[in-house]
Amino acid sequence: MYGATNDVNALGVVLSSSMATPSLDEEMAVEVASSENLPWMCIVWDDPVNLMSYVTYVFQTILGYSKKRATELMMQVHTEGKAVVSSGERDKVEADVKKLHTAGLWATMQQGG
């Protein structure tokens, strides 16, 4: 191929640079575009204050989970230290975090993947 350059490394392997490589700006644009499309997650963290029954109650009343699902999420928080309890658009997840804070739970949000 005209204009292609070949280099040989220390092991004698021919390294060809004939393939086009994206510029740094193109790589960053792809990364930004894909991260903007990721959903947001509301994460509840284990704390030493709230009873397990209360956390289950909050998941039912604030997030609308059934008793069974609320209990599963509470047990995940208790055993693993955290659980994703909701996800979606940033505004919705931010509202969930605020409601959980009002109820006294430790909650944060992050963009997921």
UniProtKB/Swiss-Prot annotation:
One Pfam assignment: ClpS
Highest taxon above the source species: Bacteria
Gene3D superfamilies to which the protein is assigned, alphabetical: 3.30.1390.10
One record GO biological process: protein catabolic process
Record's signal peptide: none
UniProt function note: Involved in the modulation of the specificity of the ClpAP-mediated ATP-dependent protein degradation.
Subunit structure, interactors included: Binds to the N-terminal domain of the chaperone ClpA.
HAMAP family reported for this sequence: ClpS (MF_00302)
Family named by the database record: Belongs to the ClpS family.
NCBIfam families: PRK00033.1-1
Protein name in the entry: ATP-dependent Clp protease adapter protein ClpS
Natural source organism: Corynebacterium diphtheriae (strain ATCC 700971 / NCTC 13129 / Biotype gravis)
Upper classification of the organism: Bacteria, Bacillati, Actinomycetota, Actinomycetes, Mycobacteriales
Originating gene: clpS
